[in-house]
Amino acid sequence: MPQLNPAPWFTILVFSWMIFLAIIPTKVMGHTSPNDSSPLSTEKHKTESWDWPWQ
């Protein structure tokens, strides 16, 4: 039964993972986002503590 012979399928598996792990991430990470987010304000928000009404 030829489908049980791992030799051709293993090489296809290895080469496909080499493509996924080497070529595709470099192409995807090469693009820059047009919307670079920057914080509008760096001041700390004032949070006041308050009591629960049932305590």
Swiss-Prot record:
Q: What is its main location?
A: mitochondrion
Transmembrane intervals: 4-24
User: Which keywords has UniProt assigned to this entry?
Assistant: ATP synthesis, CF(0), Hydrogen ion transport, Ion transport, Membrane, Mitochondrion, Transmembrane, Transmembrane helix, Transport
Could you tell me the superkingdom of the organism this chain comes from?
A: Eukaryota
List the molecular function annotations (GO) for this entry: proton transmembrane transporter activity
Q: Which PANTHER family match?
A: ATP SYNTHASE PROTEIN 8
Instruction: Spell out the protein name for this chain.
Output: ATP synthase F(0) complex subunit 8
**Phylogenetic lineage:** Eukaryota, Metazoa, Chordata, Craniata, Vertebrata
Point out the gene that encodes the protein.
mt-atp8
